[in-house]
Protein backbone atom coordinates (compact mmCIF):
# COMPACT_ATOMS: atom_id res chain seq x y z
CA UNK A 1 0.00 0.00 0.00
CA UNK A 2 1.33 3.46 -0.90
CA UNK A 3 1.74 6.03 1.84
CA UNK A 4 -0.79 8.86 1.30
CA UNK A 5 1.72 11.37 2.73
CA UNK A 6 5.01 10.64 0.93
CA UNK A 7 3.92 8.04 -1.69
CA UNK A 8 6.45 5.49 -0.44
CA UNK A 9 5.55 1.95 -1.46
CA UNK A 10 6.37 0.23 1.83
CA UNK A 11 4.04 0.43 4.82
CA UNK A 12 3.57 -1.89 7.75
CA UNK A 13 0.38 -2.90 9.52
CA UNK A 14 0.36 -1.93 13.20
CA UNK A 15 -3.15 -3.07 14.14
CA UNK A 16 -6.03 -4.95 12.46
CA UNK A 17 -9.62 -5.21 13.70
CA UNK A 18 -12.93 -6.42 12.34
CA UNK A 19 -15.57 -3.68 12.06
CA UNK A 20 -19.06 -3.32 10.55
CA UNK A 21 -20.22 -6.61 12.04
CA UNK A 22 -17.24 -8.44 10.59
CA UNK A 23 -17.80 -7.24 7.03
CA UNK A 24 -14.77 -4.93 7.01
CA UNK A 25 -11.22 -4.96 8.33
CA UNK A 26 -9.83 -1.75 9.82
CA UNK A 27 -6.04 -1.57 9.57
CA UNK A 28 -3.77 0.96 11.23
CA UNK A 29 -0.64 1.38 9.10
CA UNK A 30 2.68 3.17 9.43
CA UNK A 31 4.91 4.31 6.59
CA UNK A 32 8.46 2.92 6.86
CA UNK A 33 9.86 6.07 5.19
CA UNK A 34 8.13 9.10 6.81
CA UNK A 35 6.67 7.23 9.84
CA UNK A 36 3.24 8.82 9.38
CA UNK A 37 0.29 6.68 10.45
CA UNK A 38 -2.99 6.22 8.62
CA UNK A 39 -6.06 4.00 8.66
CA UNK A 40 -7.42 1.83 5.86
CA UNK A 41 -10.66 -0.13 5.59
CA UNK A 42 -10.94 -3.29 3.54
CA UNK A 43 -14.14 -4.98 2.48
CA UNK A 44 -15.27 -7.42 -0.13
CA UNK A 45 -16.56 -5.89 -3.33
CA UNK A 46 -20.04 -7.30 -3.62
CA UNK A 47 -21.37 -7.07 -7.14
CA UNK A 48 -25.11 -6.95 -7.63
CA UNK A 49 -26.58 -8.92 -10.53
CA UNK A 50 -27.95 -7.09 -13.57
CA UNK A 51 -31.73 -6.91 -13.90
CA UNK A 52 -33.55 -8.37 -16.91
CA UNK A 53 -36.59 -6.18 -17.53
CA UNK A 54 -39.93 -7.51 -18.79
CA UNK A 55 -39.16 -6.23 -22.29
CA UNK A 56 -35.92 -8.25 -22.33
CA UNK A 57 -33.60 -5.28 -21.87
CA UNK A 58 -30.90 -5.47 -19.23
CA UNK A 59 -29.77 -2.78 -16.83
CA UNK A 60 -27.56 -2.51 -13.76
CA UNK A 61 -29.24 -3.09 -10.40
CA UNK A 62 -30.42 0.32 -9.13
CA UNK A 63 -30.48 0.51 -5.35
CA UNK A 64 -31.95 4.03 -5.48
CA UNK A 65 -34.91 2.77 -7.51
CA UNK A 66 -35.51 -0.04 -5.03
CA UNK A 67 -35.36 2.38 -2.10
CA UNK A 68 -37.64 4.96 -3.71
CA UNK A 69 -40.21 2.26 -4.49
CA UNK A 70 -40.21 1.09 -0.90
CA UNK A 71 -40.35 4.64 0.47
CA UNK A 72 -43.31 5.41 -1.78
CA UNK A 73 -45.12 2.28 -0.56
CA UNK A 74 -44.55 3.01 3.15
CA UNK A 75 -45.23 6.75 2.86
CA UNK A 76 -47.22 8.00 5.89
CA UNK A 77 -47.13 4.52 7.45
CA UNK A 78 -45.64 3.66 10.87
CA UNK A 79 -42.45 2.13 9.48
CA UNK A 80 -39.03 3.33 10.66
CA UNK A 81 -36.07 4.04 8.37
CA UNK A 82 -34.18 1.31 10.22
CA UNK A 83 -36.85 -1.25 9.27
CA UNK A 84 -36.76 -0.03 5.66
CA UNK A 85 -32.96 -0.32 5.51
CA UNK A 86 -33.09 -3.83 6.97
CA UNK A 87 -35.70 -4.89 4.40
CA UNK A 88 -33.63 -3.43 1.54
CA UNK A 89 -30.55 -5.18 2.88
CA UNK A 90 -32.41 -8.52 2.94
CA UNK A 91 -33.50 -8.03 -0.68
CA UNK A 92 -29.94 -7.26 -1.80
CA UNK A 93 -28.51 -10.19 0.18
CA UNK A 94 -31.05 -12.56 -1.38
CA UNK A 95 -30.20 -11.30 -4.88
CA UNK A 96 -26.46 -11.72 -4.26
CA UNK A 97 -27.04 -15.19 -2.78
CA UNK A 98 -28.54 -16.40 -6.06
CA UNK A 99 -25.01 -16.38 -7.47
CA UNK A 100 -26.48 -15.33 -10.81
CA UNK A 101 -25.04 -12.54 -12.95
CA UNK A 102 -28.55 -11.57 -14.06
CA UNK A 103 -31.94 -11.85 -12.38
CA UNK A 104 -35.43 -11.16 -13.76
CA UNK A 105 -37.15 -7.97 -12.60
CA UNK A 106 -40.05 -10.14 -11.41
CA UNK A 107 -37.75 -11.65 -8.80
CA UNK A 108 -36.84 -8.19 -7.50
CA UNK A 109 -40.52 -7.19 -7.39
CA UNK A 110 -41.53 -10.38 -5.59
CA UNK A 111 -38.76 -9.93 -3.01
CA UNK A 112 -39.96 -6.35 -2.47
CA UNK A 113 -43.56 -7.53 -1.95
CA UNK A 114 -42.39 -10.22 0.47
CA UNK A 115 -40.53 -7.66 2.58
CA UNK A 116 -43.42 -5.19 2.46
CA UNK A 117 -45.85 -7.90 3.55
CA UNK A 118 -43.70 -8.41 6.66
CA UNK A 119 -43.32 -4.66 7.30
CA UNK A 120 -46.79 -3.22 6.71
CA UNK A 121 -49.87 -4.73 5.08
CA UNK A 122 -51.13 -1.41 3.69
CA UNK A 123 -47.73 -0.70 2.12
CA UNK A 124 -47.82 -4.18 0.59
CA UNK A 125 -51.26 -3.51 -0.99
CA UNK A 126 -50.06 -0.12 -2.30
CA UNK A 127 -47.00 -1.64 -3.94
CA UNK A 128 -48.83 -4.71 -5.25
CA UNK A 129 -51.57 -2.56 -6.81
CA UNK A 130 -49.00 -0.72 -8.92
CA UNK A 131 -46.61 -3.63 -9.51
CA UNK A 132 -49.35 -6.09 -10.47
CA UNK A 133 -51.31 -3.32 -12.29
CA UNK A 134 -54.63 -3.95 -10.56
CA UNK A 135 -57.48 -3.00 -12.89
CA UNK A 136 -60.51 -3.28 -10.62
CA UNK A 137 -61.67 -3.66 -7.03
CA UNK A 138 -61.85 -7.46 -7.22
CA UNK A 139 -58.07 -7.64 -7.68
CA UNK A 140 -57.62 -5.55 -4.52
CA UNK A 141 -59.99 -7.96 -2.76
CA UNK A 142 -57.92 -10.95 -3.85
CA UNK A 143 -54.72 -9.34 -2.57
CA UNK A 144 -56.37 -8.51 0.76
CA UNK A 145 -57.75 -12.05 1.04
CA UNK A 146 -54.23 -13.38 0.50
CA UNK A 147 -53.04 -11.25 3.45
CA UNK A 148 -55.77 -12.57 5.72
CA UNK A 149 -54.75 -16.22 5.24
UniProtKB/Swiss-Prot annotation:
Keywords: ATP-binding, DNA-binding, Metal-binding, Nucleotide-binding, Repressor, Transcription, Transcription regulation, Zinc, Zinc-finger. GO terms for molecular function: ATP binding; DNA binding; zinc ion binding. A zinc finger (unnamed) spans 3-34. It comes from the Bacteria. InterPro entries: ATP-cone_dom, NrdR-like_N, RNR_NrdR-like. PANTHER family: TRANSCRIPTIONAL REPRESSOR NRDR. Belongs to the NrdR family. This is Transcriptional repressor NrdR. It comes from Shewanella sp. (strain W3-18-1). The gene is nrdR.
